[in-house]
Amino acid sequence: MKIPNRQKFTKNHKRNLITKETRKTGLVLGNYGIKATETGYLKMKQMERIKGDLVKKLKDNMDIYFNFYPLFGLTNKGTARMGAGKGEVSEWYVLVKKGSIVVEFIKSRMTAGAMQKVIRYSANKWPIKVRMTQIKQGLYEKKI
């Protein structure tokens, strides 16, 4: 997974975990998606594992659009604590808010039941709770 090439500030404060997502709450590209039902952090290793599992399970049945990218650096303190500052960036993570669409599945050739099995398999690997959403006849979003 790629990391940000250049950022103005690499060492950030921790973000607020209380708020809900207001912008990315509906499916835009695909018929099926994975929606976060709680707020939390996704680290880069977790993102890579989730991507690998979904690609492995779905193979060539559809295109997958991942709606997350590691934006924030997680720092560790150095060995000498006194006056050393904040520390170097050790990992990258992204904040996933409750209600946001995290993954979309485009050009699906699978039924809703088969898709639900894949998402249930993938949900065990997530550090937050997620659920499947789908668009029914292009009119509205259905909770499954």
From Swiss-Prot:
UniProt GO BP: mitochondrial translation
Keyword Ribonucleoprotein: yes
Superkingdom, natural source: Eukaryota
A GO term for molecular function: rRNA binding
Keywords from the UniProt entry: Mitochondrion, Ribonucleoprotein, Ribosomal protein
GO cellular component, one term: mitochondrial large ribosomal subunit
Signal peptide: none
Subcellular location(s) of the protein: Mitochondrion
UniProt xrefs under InterPro entries: Ribosomal_uL16, Ribosomal_uL16_bact-type, Ribosomal_uL16_CS, Ribosomal_uL16_dom, Ribosomal_uL16_sf
Parts forming coiled coils: none
UniProt-listed SUPFAM superfamilies: Ribosomal protein L16p/L10e
Database matches in PANTHER family: 50S/60S RIBOSOMAL PROTEIN L16, LARGE RIBOSOMAL SUBUNIT PROTEIN UL16M
Entry's family note: Belongs to the universal ribosomal protein uL16 family.
Protein known as: Large ribosomal subunit protein uL16m
Originating organism: Dictyostelium discoideum (Social amoeba)
Gene: mrpl16
